[in-house]
């Protein structure tokens, strides 16, 4: 089982897990940023609560 984990970890070590088709290569920078977008909403919740004094 440990060997299976090591084999799978070998493939997941890169920053990008998949390559977009060539027709969509212009969207590569956007796709790289997309996983971070939910974190912005999470941080926005704290900024919003700070603006209303955490009521």
UniProtKB/Swiss-Prot annotation:
User: Could you list the residue ranges that cross the membrane?
Assistant: 26-46
Propeptide stretch(es), residue numbers: 1-18
Its chief place of residence is: plastid
Q: Which GO terms describe its biological process?
A: photosynthesis
Q: Where in the cell is it found?
A: Plastid, Chloroplast thylakoid membrane
Q: Which GO terms describe its cellular component?
A: chloroplast thylakoid membrane; photosystem II reaction center
The chain's disulfide connectivity reads: none
Report how it sits in the membrane: Single-pass membrane protein
In terms of superkingdom, the source organism counts as: Eukaryota
SUPFAM superfamilies in UniProt: Photosystem II reaction center protein K, PsbK
Q: Which UniProt keywords apply?
A: Chloroplast, Membrane, Photosynthesis, Photosystem II, Plastid, Reaction center, Thylakoid, Transmembrane, Transmembrane helix
Report the protein's function: One of the components of the core complex of photosystem II (PSII). PSII is a light-driven water:plastoquinone oxidoreductase that uses light energy to abstract electrons from H(2)O, generating O(2) and a proton gradient subsequently used for ATP formation. It consists of a core antenna complex that captures photons, and an electron transfer chain that converts photonic excitation into a charge separation.
**Family assignment from sequence similarity:** Belongs to the PsbK family.
What do we know about how this protein assembles, alone or with others?
PSII is composed of 1 copy each of membrane proteins PsbA, PsbB, PsbC, PsbD, PsbE, PsbF, PsbH, PsbI, PsbJ, PsbK, PsbL, PsbM, PsbT, PsbX, PsbY, PsbZ, Psb30/Ycf12, at least 3 peripheral proteins of the oxygen-evolving complex and a large number of cofactors. It forms dimeric complexes.
* Name recorded for this polypeptide: Photosystem II reaction center protein K
Which organism encodes this protein?
Marchantia polymorpha
